[in-house]
């Protein structure tokens, strides 16, 4: 089986590019894009989900708290909510422009099931109209799924039709629209069933039902649109294995095939099962073919969207339409002029931990945190370097922290790193910061102290290096000292906290600018206690004795600011003194 047709394409003149959602809400998953060309414009629709898919692959050493495969939803909203974004794609540069969320507000109703929105939309051009068609499951209390067709204009849904069928079934999904035959879909592949939707009644009726001589090991389920190629109809289907672990946690493996039909809808050729980029979960919703090549859009682990350009000869070879020999898949290097995106070096060697890590860094810097998490987790599962595995696991937790609203998951993922190597301080700092954020100061203080015990175990090993240093944000043990001083203040240890901040400020530790300023601010804000008050015993200490100074028996200003004003005004009387931001009139005024 070819586990990496993207590599096949790259080694034979193809290219791949990420489809980046510019304004990705919270950095959660983007997936399952579709593609269509109408006149001189090529459109792409990208599915955006509010979850991040966590999938521990390979040896599955690092499960989430809910198993090896799970949707990490906001913990205050477990619905699987989808929104769709429409943009225009330049097929030469892969530049994605004019990307906006499709406005569906005209037809939306309050969802009554947990799968919300139109899922896995395929783009369609029927009669020069831009349409999307996917499954919606939020209109019934039991999640009944039906395909829908929506017309889109200027990023707004202007019509929505729900397709009914003659038989009462629970879930209809992944129908493949036939692009040159309006309102027709391939509903099943073996046997091949084609339905046609009456646009007046929105009822789909079977118009073709053909047994096939080919026998596949798994059901062929819908994927891309069905498009014309030479004298054939072609589409990319998906198939899946589903199982449960010994702990009764679900897992799955997705595969794809190219299916080729003749004009009478006989399957005359097909590819072997394949994967796009060697992940267990991938999904294809888009196929466009023109003179410049074959364009396939697909999702990676529900967290990232991609477009693959494949030369015609590669497509024909995979589909069984040609026996032309292709370049060797065992190559692991590209020439510099062959590298067009940060994905290329990964695609050439997808089980290289470092390459997974660097793709994760690229996605993180693009604020695509769910995608970054996928690659950091793969890096952790693949690496043989314990130091790096620890750091990759911290990066996984960091992605969930930045996405937000997943506190319980974040805690468990941090502990994945700590249990892997409990002798390193970085994880304890992140745990201390975690509990401080939750105002659990005693727990935060405890983890900071544990971290300090680990700081000298191995200074070389504990040195975070490379592009992820600023993400993990551990530049030295002084951050643990800071956490201890901060938590002591919130736990009522005022004098101790002041001393700890002061000791840290005057220490020889190499403080970063942000922490230097933060420590200085805390020293100023927390102030000395008892306060520096003035009383008549200090008269002789006044450098400038203003008029009437001898009348002052006591003044409660925190740091002599009242005395300063009188000094500057030479004891002026009968005026008004306004202090903005004052405290108690006698303590800490």
Give the residues covered by each predicted segment.
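SAM cofactor-binding core of SAM-dependent methyltransferases
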Residues: 554-589
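Start-of-helix register in tetratricopeptide repeats
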Residues: 354, 387-391, 426, 479, ...
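Beta-propeller domains
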Residues: 2-330, 428
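"A position-specific structural signal for the A-helix of alpha-solenoid helical repeats
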Residues: 358, 395, 430, 483, ...
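Structural motif corresponding to the intra-repeat A-B loop/turn of tetratricopeptide repeats
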Residues: 366, 403-404, 438, 491, ...
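Short coil turns that delineate tetratricopeptide repeat
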Residues: 350-351, 384-387, 422, 456, ...
């Amino acid at each position: 089986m070819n586990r990496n047709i993207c590599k096949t394409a790259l080694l034979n003149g193809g290219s791949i590019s990420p489809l980046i959602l510019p304004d990705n809400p919270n950095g959660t998953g983007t997936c399952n894009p579709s593609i269509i060309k109408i006149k001189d414009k090529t459109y792409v629709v990208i599915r955006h989900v509010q979850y991040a898919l966590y999938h521990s692959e390979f040896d599955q050493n690092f499960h989430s708290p809910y198993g090896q495969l799970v949707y990490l939803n906001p913990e205050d909203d477990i619905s699987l909510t989808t929104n769709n974004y429409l943009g225009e794609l330049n097929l030469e540069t892969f530049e994605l422009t004019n990307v906006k969320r499709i406005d569906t507000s005209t037809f939306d109703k309050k969802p009554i099931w947990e799968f919300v929105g139109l899922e896995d939309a395929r783009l369609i051009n029927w009669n020069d109209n831009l349409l999307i068609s996917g499954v919606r499951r939020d209109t019934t209390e039991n999640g009944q799924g039906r395909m829908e067709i929506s017309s889109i204009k200027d990023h707004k849904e202007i019509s929505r039709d729900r397709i009914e069928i003659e038989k009462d079934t629970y879930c209809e999904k992944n129908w493949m629209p036939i692009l040159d035959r309006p309102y027709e879909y391939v509903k099943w592949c073996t046997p091949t069933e084609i339905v046609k939707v009456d646009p007046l009644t929105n009822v789909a009726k079977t118009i073709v039902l053909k047994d096939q001589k080919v026998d596949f090991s798994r059901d062929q389920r819908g994927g891309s649109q069905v498009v014309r190629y030479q004298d054939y109809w072609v589409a990319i289907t998906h198939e899946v294995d589903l199982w449960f672990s010994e702990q009764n946690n679900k897992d799955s493996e997705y595969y794809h095939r190219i299916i080729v039909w003749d004009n009478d809808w006989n399957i005359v050729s097909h590819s072997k099962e394949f994967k796009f980029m060697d992940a267990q979960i991938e999904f294809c919703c888009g196929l466009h073919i023109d003179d410049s090549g074959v364009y396939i859009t697909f999702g990676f682990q529900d967290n990232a969207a991609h477009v693959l350009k494949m030369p015609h000869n590669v497509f024909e070879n995979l589909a069984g339409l040609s026996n032309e020999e292709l370049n060797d898949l065992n190559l692991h290097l590209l020439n510099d002029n062959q590298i067009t995106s940060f994905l290329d070096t990964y695609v050439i060697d997808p089980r290289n931990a470092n390459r997974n890590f660097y793709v994760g860094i690229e996605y993180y810097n693009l604020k695509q945190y769910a995608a970054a998490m996928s690659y950091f987790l793969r890096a952790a599962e693949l690496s043989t370097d314990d130091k790096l595995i620890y750091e990759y696991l911290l990066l996984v937790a960091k992605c969930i922290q930045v996405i937000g609203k997943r506190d319980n998951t974040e805690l468990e993922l941090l502990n994945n790193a700590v249990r892997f190597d409990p002798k390193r301080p970085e994880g304890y700092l992140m745990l201390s910061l975690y509990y401080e954020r939750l105002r659990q100061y005693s727990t935060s203080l405890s983890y900071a102290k544990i971290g300090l015990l680990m700081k000298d175990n191995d200074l070389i090993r504990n040195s975070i290096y490379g592009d992820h240093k600023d993400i993990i944000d551990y530049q030295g043990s002084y951050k643990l000292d800071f956490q201890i001083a901060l938590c002591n203040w919130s736990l009522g240890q005022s004098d101790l906290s002041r001393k700890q901040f002061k000791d840290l400020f005057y220490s020889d530790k190499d403080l970063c600018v942000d922490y230097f300023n933060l420590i200085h601010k805390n020293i100023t804000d927390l102030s000395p206690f008892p306060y520096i008050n003035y009383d008549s015993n200090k008269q002789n200490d006044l450098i400038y004795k203003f008029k009437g100074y001898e009348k002052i028996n006591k003044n409660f200003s925190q740091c002599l600011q009242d005395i300063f004003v009188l000094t500057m005004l030479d004891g002026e009387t009968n005026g008004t003194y306004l202090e903005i931001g004052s405290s108690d009139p006698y303590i800490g005024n």
